[in-house]
């Protein structure tokens, strides 16, 4: 609900966010985040205008899926990937929101390990870079969070 205060009601993103959260609350006990996917697909995601990364769709979808999954990254992120028009942006934003809500321990260990070390695909000189170690060097005094 705090997010809605930042989204003006008279804007596309504000209207979509309010509708998406209403859908999430209405269908909370009806399949969780995955049960919400068809509703978001048809009521929030625009299938005419072909700019699927628009914030007016991605932000509401991420908010609604986070609510429907009870803040669980494992419940919300895969559902976000099922919305084809926003699949390039919604999973990342949904993961960021649920991670911020629940903390790093809520992210499944298998996900953390799969994403921890860079393969160097786009930037070969970064192959083998451990992102947790790098984060520990960037945040003074933290020293890295084990398993984070």
Question: Where on the chain are the PLM-derived regions?
Answer:
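Catalytic phosphate/nucleotide-handling subdomain of diverse soluble enzymes
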Residues: 54-144
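Accessory "access/gating" subregions that flank catalytic or transport cores
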Residues: 1-84
């Amino acid at each position: 609900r705090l997010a809605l205060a930042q989204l003006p009601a008279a804007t596309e993103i504000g209207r979509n966010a309010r509708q998406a959260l209403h859908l999430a609350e209405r269908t909370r006990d009806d399949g969780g985040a995955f049960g919400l996917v068809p509703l978001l697909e048809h009521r929030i995601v625009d299938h005419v205008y072909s700019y699927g990364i628009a914030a007016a769709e991605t932000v509401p979808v991420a908010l609604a899926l986070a609510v429907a999954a009870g803040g669980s990254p494992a419940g919300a992120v895969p559902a976000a990937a099922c919305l084809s028009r926003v699949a390039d942006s919604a999973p990342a934003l949904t993961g960021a929101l649920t991670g911020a809500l629940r903390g790093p321990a809520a992210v499944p260990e298998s996900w953390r390990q799969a994403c921890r070390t860079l393969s160097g695909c786009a930037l070969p000189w970064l192959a083998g870079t451990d992102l947790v170690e790098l984060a520990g060097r960037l945040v003074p005094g933290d020293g890295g969070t084990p398993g984070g």
